[in-house]
Amino acid sequence: MKDGFIKAAAGTPDVRVADCEFNATEIIRMVHEMEEQGAKVMVFPELCITAYTCGDLFWQENLLEEAKVQLVRIAEETADVDALIFVGLPLEYKGKLYNVAAGLNHGEILGFVPKINLPNYNEFYEARYFTSGENLDGTVHIDRDVYRARYESDTESDDVEFEIEMSEFDGFEELEELEEDEEPDYIDENDEEEDGELYEEDIWISPNMIFTCEEMPKLQIAAEICEDLWV
């Protein structure tokens, strides 16, 4: 922070349609470039893990699973980056497909924010594939050991080990939607093994989340995807 301001960055990585591994590699590369420039909030395009133009491939289970594998990879390979990072992916929840932004910080997947307003005109066909996330409120279970094993089986790199340390911008957490006069209830979405190693998570999915910094309580960030900003 300088003079009460933080630096935000928007990145547009090169992507290949349905090539989640390539796209994740580009996202990770850009995160580290942004880090070198001092960015503390990093925003990537909607559906950047799969690419936006997958069409009917969005219905392929293999694509949806690989998107989650690469989301875990992005989270873990940027665990040492002191920033709040948003990336986009398709996410299946209770039999329906959502266009979501995932908030990441220090290796944690903090929450999924679903898109509400789905364009279905001209060259846009989002309603063909996705469901509006309006009024959605629940948790998505992510077994990180399973997804970690999948991407590590395709690489010779060492295991990614990290700790979540207190720092100026550590500890973005999600807030549930608050009723009137209700006090904020911080969510601890992480299940841990006895040795403290992150094992699995139940991660909130809702359009009504605010990401706030523990060290700077007045820094509160919401995510809106494309048309949600102006409709």
Language-model regions: role of each:
Residues M1-V231:
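Enzyme catalytic cores with a strong preference for nitrogen-chemistry domains
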